[in-house]
């Protein structure tokens, strides 16, 4: 039987469904005694060879799916951190790698160290395709990619827009604007 006719038979299902497999050559180098001994020692694989090769029976009722580390069906965990120095930032990155949400309250840090900490954790968040959000003054939320962050705050949309150009209106607009963080106050 040629290769093309075998392929046609496989596609059509003729020879294999009828049990016409006699023209295939098998090697019977191993004696029958050794086959029985290997089946007795082979465990689950020995029971498969006894019957229909496509019937796995009850031996493989379990699943072969292996879960991802860090993902569980338990409740999600949020870490609230109030670091006092930059040396505590690797803990935030480790929590993100373990698929935990991190809230950083940086009010206890010096402004330059706080900026460095935000940049460091934001880089780690970007590396794992996570999300970052500024929650408040010196408070930031960093979430892994498995967490969806939505912002339903309408504070930004409700800020009035000043149309006039007189100096008094500009001063009122600057006073009403959100204050900049202490670490970002640099003269341009």
From Swiss-Prot:
Region listing for Disordered, in residue ranges: 152-188
Subcellular location: Cytoplasm
Gene Ontology CC entries for this record: cytoplasm
Polar residues compositional bias, start-end: 152-162
Family according to the record: Belongs to the SepF family.
InterPro entries: Cell_div_SepF, Cell_div_SepF/SepF-rel, SepF-like_sf
One Pfam family linked to the record: SepF
The protein's assembly and partners: Homodimer. Interacts with FtsZ.
Keyword Cell division: yes
Function: Cell division protein that is part of the divisome complex and is recruited early to the Z-ring. Probably stimulates Z-ring formation, perhaps through the cross-linking of FtsZ protofilaments. Its function overlaps with FtsA.
PANTHER family, per database record: CELL DIVISION PROTEIN SEPF
Keywords: Cell cycle, Cell division, Cytoplasm, Septation
A biological process term (GO) from this entry: FtsZ-dependent cytokinesis
Name of the protein in its database record: Cell division protein SepF
């Amino acid at each position: 039987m040629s290769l093309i006719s075998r392929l046609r038979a496989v596609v059509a299902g003729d020879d294999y469904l009828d049990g016409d497999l006699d023209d295939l050559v098998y090697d019977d180098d191993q004696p029958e005694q050794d086959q029985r001994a290997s089946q007795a020692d082979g465990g689950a694989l020995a029971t498969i060879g006894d019957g229909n090769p496509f019937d796995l029976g009850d031996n493989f009722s379990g699943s072969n799916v292996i879960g991802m580390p860090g993902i569980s069906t338990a409740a999600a965990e949020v870490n609230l951190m109030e670091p006092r120095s930059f040396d505590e930032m690797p803990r935030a990155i480790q929590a993100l790698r373990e698929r935990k949400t991190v809230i950083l309250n940086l009010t206890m840090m010096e402004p330059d160290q706080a900026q460095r900490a935000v940049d460091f954790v934001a880089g780690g968040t970007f590396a794992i395709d996570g999300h970052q959000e500024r929650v408040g003054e010196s408070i930031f939320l960093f979430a892994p990619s498995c967490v969806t962050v939505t912002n339903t705050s309408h504070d930004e949309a409700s800020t009035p827009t000043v149309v006039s150009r007189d100096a008094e209106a500009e001063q009122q607009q600057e006073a009403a604007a959100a204050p900049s963080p202490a670490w970002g106050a640099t003269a341009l």
